[in-house]
């Protein structure tokens, strides 16, 4: 648990300058690690929940996702958020991209799975709170559908290679460090 907390707050920056965003991200991270479906959905963009068919359907789908992870012996162990990203605004919507590294335990007790993910933090004028939008499996077209205000105004940050690495437990810290450096380089290159 301590390692998780240390890694969550490992990087400080502009997103950290918005205490409301930092708090919402911390809540989302803790909920994702513990499998707290209600907590996850309370931090999820209403646009996503609506697109899933409302809160009941979103709850059902999210529960199924977590159940299938458990069934396959996979558990999110920690999430490391790269928060050195600028907060921007379009049409009354503040937003910030947050690359993440996820570390998951697997059925093979001596192995861990590590992958990268992308969150989009949104703060819309009508909600007045930060919510999140996981755009991992989305292309620019899908983003434009969910956020027509962004159409033609922003493009998705370049993806890291989307593969899941399986490493021995002793290699986790080194691998996470390497991925965070890749994210850092990618972010700096495209700013």
Regions found by a protein language model. Give the residues of each.
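Hydrophobic, Leu/Ile/Phe/Ala-enriched alpha-helical segments that form helix-helix packing faces
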Residues: 32, 65-69, 102, 121
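Cleaved targeting-peptide boundary
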Residues: 14-24, 189-191
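Bacterial Sec-dependent N-terminal signal peptides
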Residues: 1-19
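Short, aromatic-enriched amphipathic alpha-helices that serve as compact interaction elements
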Residues: 19-35
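Exposed beta-sheet edge and beta->alpha loop/turn motif
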Residues: 87-191
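Short solvent-exposed beta->alpha transition segments
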Residues: 22, 39-91, 95
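Generic anion/oxyanion-binding catalytic loop in active/binding sites
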Residues: 4, 29, 47
